[in-house]
UniProtKB/Swiss-Prot annotation:
Entry-linked PANTHER family: PEPTIDYL-TRNA HYDROLASE (PTHR17224:SF1)
Major subcellular location class: cytoplasm
This protein's name: Peptidyl-tRNA hydrolase
Catalysed reaction, written as an equation: an N-acyl-L-alpha-aminoacyl-tRNA + H2O = an N-acyl-L-amino acid + a tRNA + H(+)
Native organism taxonomy: Bacteria, Pseudomonadati, Pseudomonadota, Alphaproteobacteria, Rickettsiales
Family designation: Belongs to the PTH family.
NCBIfam families linked: pth (TIGR00447)
Keywords assigned by UniProt, alphabetized: Cytoplasm, Hydrolase, RNA-binding, tRNA-binding
Membrane spanning stretches: none
Biological processes per GO annotation: protein quality control for misfolded or incompletely synthesized proteins; rescue of stalled ribosome
Subunit field text: Monomer.
Keyword check for RNA-binding: yes
Length: 185
């Protein structure tokens, strides 16, 4: 069993923001497995479940705001008794240019409030799929930048990155993490 978490903020006003790239990605991945989300209030998230090649996959989108994402992660992790090594978090990263993706296990949170929240409840020994959204230009405030919609040209480039994750996601299910890491760059 694996748990895949897409980070973002709830609400239509945030749907296409840079900070919601995790939600955008997880929706496309779940769709690939013909799995749809439903709200589970007891877990503070939207959840979708499927089985692929005998392995259960649980997808979640926290319904809390980003800085409280750990609340839903710990609820689902505890209920399903999931080892942190089987947890994959997809999130935005301003230290990577748009369209760049990096995969890593463990490590720091890079100042990302969603990761800080998750680290606070399960530690940091889980997998991260970091999706680049670039840095703000012209001294724009970081929070303002992340909570604004992608420019159309950026969105198209970001979707190319998401497609690389979706098209290679089976490698995660096969526990070929190094191969996944190399294919998504």
């Amino acid at each position: 069993m694996i748990l895949v978490i897409g980070l973002g903020n709830p609400g239509k006003e945030y749907q296409y923001t840079r900070h919601n790239i995790g939600f955008i990605a997880i929706e496309k991945i779940a769709n690939q497995y013909n799995s749809s989300f439903s709200t589970k209030k007891q877990f503070n998230c939207e959840i979708a479940e499927t089985i692929s090649d005998g392995q259960k996959i649980i997808f979640i989108k926290p319904t809390t705001y980003m800085n409280l994402s750990g609340k839903s992660v710990i609820s689902v992790k505890t209920y399903y008794n999931i080892n942190p090594a089987k947890i994959f978090v997809i999130h935005d990263d301003i230290d990577l240019e748009t369209c760049r993706i990096k995969f890593k296990t463990g490590g720091g949170n890079g100042g990302h409030n969603g990761l800080k929240s998750i680290d606070g409840v399960i530690g940091n020994n889980y997998n991260r799929i970091r999706v680049g959204v670039g840095r703000p230009k012209n001294n724009q405030d970081v929070a303002d930048y992340l909570l604004n919609n992608f420019l159309q040209s950026e969105y198209e480039i970001a979707m190319q990155a998401i497609d690389r994750i979706v098209n290679n996601f089976d490698l995660i299910l096969e526990n070929k993490l190094e191969k996944f890491k190399n294919k998504i760059v």
